[in-house]
C-alpha cells in the first residue's frame, strides 16, 4: 500500500513474467532495487543442472570402482612419495648389491638385485593393510581383492592372465608364483624339502678331532672357484656353519682366514667335501683341486656351538616341532 518494500508484481507459472521487473528490498537511500527475474530463472536452472551432473557422478554402485577412481587420482603423488622413501634407503641396497657382486663374481647384475629387493619391500608392505585372515596368500602372490584398474596394467606387463582363485583348489595353487603359473616345470623341483637327516647330520660326529675347511676353499677344491657360493646352491644338503664375529676373530688369529669384516664365512666338514669329490658327479673331473683344502680343527667351545646348530637344523627335529602339541 504505502511502503515501497511491500510492492509485489504479479508472477506467472514460472515465478515471474518474462521481461518483467521485480522490486527487491529498499536500498540505503530508500530506493527500490530492480531485479531481473529472468536472470533468477537462469541461475536456478544452472543449479539444477549442477545437481543432475552431481547425481550422475555419484551413481556408481560398485565400491571398488569408486575407490579405484580415487586411487588413480592420488597414485602419482603416492608414487612420488614412495620413490622418495626408496631413495632414502637406496644407499644400503647399493652397498649390499656391490658386496654380493664382489663375493660371487662380475656376472652378477647389481642393478637387478636392487630392483628385486625394492619389489620385495613393496610385497611385504602389503601386510600393513592385510585383513588378518588371508596373510599367507598375500605373502606369495597378489592380493585377492586386487583393484580392477590394476589388473589390466599388470596383465600387460606380465603377459599372462592373473590366476583366479576357485573353489576346490588346494592351498598350494594359491601360493604358486608367476613362474609356476606360466608352466615352468623346474619350479616344482626347487620346492622339494631338503633332507637334513642320516649320519652326516648327527651332531655326535662333531668333536675336537673333526677337521673343517672354509667354504671358499671347498668351492675351489671342487672346481667352482670362478663363482663363490656355487657349492651351496649345487649341494644344499651339505652342513655349513656360518661363523659369527667371535668365530671369525679366532679363525683370523689362527691364520686360517683373513679378516673379512662384514663378509660371511662358512665352515664345512672336510669329510663331506672329500666324499663329494669321490662321488660320480666329480669322479674324473679335471678341475678338482683337493690340495686347496687346508683343513684345521676347532676349539671345544666352537664345536659345541656347531653341534647345537646342527641339532636345530635336523629334519627329524623339524618334524617333532611341527607335531608337538601347543603349549598351554
Swiss-Prot record:
Residues 196-315 are annotated as: Important for DNA and nucleosome binding. Residues 12-22 have a biased composition (Gly residues). GO terms for cellular component: chromosome; histone deacetylase complex; nucleolus; nucleus. Residues 142-158 have a biased composition (Basic and acidic residues). Residues 158-172, 215-236 bind DNA. A motif (Nuclear localization signal) lies at residues 163-169. Residues 1-30, 142-176 are annotated as: Disordered. Residues 56-147 are annotated as: Important for dimerization. InterPro entries: DNTTIP1_dimer, TdIF1, TdIF1_C. One of its GO terms (molecular function) is nucleosome binding. The modification Phosphoserine is found at residue 160. Increases DNTT terminal deoxynucleotidyltransferase activity (in vitro). Also acts as a transcriptional regulator, binding to the consensus sequence 5'-GNTGCATG-3' following an AT-tract. Associates with RAB20 promoter and positively regulates its transcription. Binds DNA and nucleosomes; may recruit HDAC1 complexes to nucleosomes or naked DNA. Monomer and homodimer. A minor proportion may form homotrimers. Interacts with ZNF541. Interacts with the terminal deoxynucleotidyltransferase DNTT. Interacts with TRERF1. Identified in a histone deacetylase complex that contains DNTTIP1, HDAC1 and MIDEAS; this complex assembles into a tetramer that contains four copies of each protein chain. Component of a histone deacetylase complex containing DNTTIP1, ZNF541, HDAC1 and HDAC2. Identified in a complex with KCTD19, HDAC1, HDAC2 and ZNF541. The N-terminal domain mediates dimerization. This is Deoxynucleotidyltransferase terminal-interacting protein 1. It comes from Mus musculus (Mouse). The gene is Dnttip1.
Amino acid at each position: 500500500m504505502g511502503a515501497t518494500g511491500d510492492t509485489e508484481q504479479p508472477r506467472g507459472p514460472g515465478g515471474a513474467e518474462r521481461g518483467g521487473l521485480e522490486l527487491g528490498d529498499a536500498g540505503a537511500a530508500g530506493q527500490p532495487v530492480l531485479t531481473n527475474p529472468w536472470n533468477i530463472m537462469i541461475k536456478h536452472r544452472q543449479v539444477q543442472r549442477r545437481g543432475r551432473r552431481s547425481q550422475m557422478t555419484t551413481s556408481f554402485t560398485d565400491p571398488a570402482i569408486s575407490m579405484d577412481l580415487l586411487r588413480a587420482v592420488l597414485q602419482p603423488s603416492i608414487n612420488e612419495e614412495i620413490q622418495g622413501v626408496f631413495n632414502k634407503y637406496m644407499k644400503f641396497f647399493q652397498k649390499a648389491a656391490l658386496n654380493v657382486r664382489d663375493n660371487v663374481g662380475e656376472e652378477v647384475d647389481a642393478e637387478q638385485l636392487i630392483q628385486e629387493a625394492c619389489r620385495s619391500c613393496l610385497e611385504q608392505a602389503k601386510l600393513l593393510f592385510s585383513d588378518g585372515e588371508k596373510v599367507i596368500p598375500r605373502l606369495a602372490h597378489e592380493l585377492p581383492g586386487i583393484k580392477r584398474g590394476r589388473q589390466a596394467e599388470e596383465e600387460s606387463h606380465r603377459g599372462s592372465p592373473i590366476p583366479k582363485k576357485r573353489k576346490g583348489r588346494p592351498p598350494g595353487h594359491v601360493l604358486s608364483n608367476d613362474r609356476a603359473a606360466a608352466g615352468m616345470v623346474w619350479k616344482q623341483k626347487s620346492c622339494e624339502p631338503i633332507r637334513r637327516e642320516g649320519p652326516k647330520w648327527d651332531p655326535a660326529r662333531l668333536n675336537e678331532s673333526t677337521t673343517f675347511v672354509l667354504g671358499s676353499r671347498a668351492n675351489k677344491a671342487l672346481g667352482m672357484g670362478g663363482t663363490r657360493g656355487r657349492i651351496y646352491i649345487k649341494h644344499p644338503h651339505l652342513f655349513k656353519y656360518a661363523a659369527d664375529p667371535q668365530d671369525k676373530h679366532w679363525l683370523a688369529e689362527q691364520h686360517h682366514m683373513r679378516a673379512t669384516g662384514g663378509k660371511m664365512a662358512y665352515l664345512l666338514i672336510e669329510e663331506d667335501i672329500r666324499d663329494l669329490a669321490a662321488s660320480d658327479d666329480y669322479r674324473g673331473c679335471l678341475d678338482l683341486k683337493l690340495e686347496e683344502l687346508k683343513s684345521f680343527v676347532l676349539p671345544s667351545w666352537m664345536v659345541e656351538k656347531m653341534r647345537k646348530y646342527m641339532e636345530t637344523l635336523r629334519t627329524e627335529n623339524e618334524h617333532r616341532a611341527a607335531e608337538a602339541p601347543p603349549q598351554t
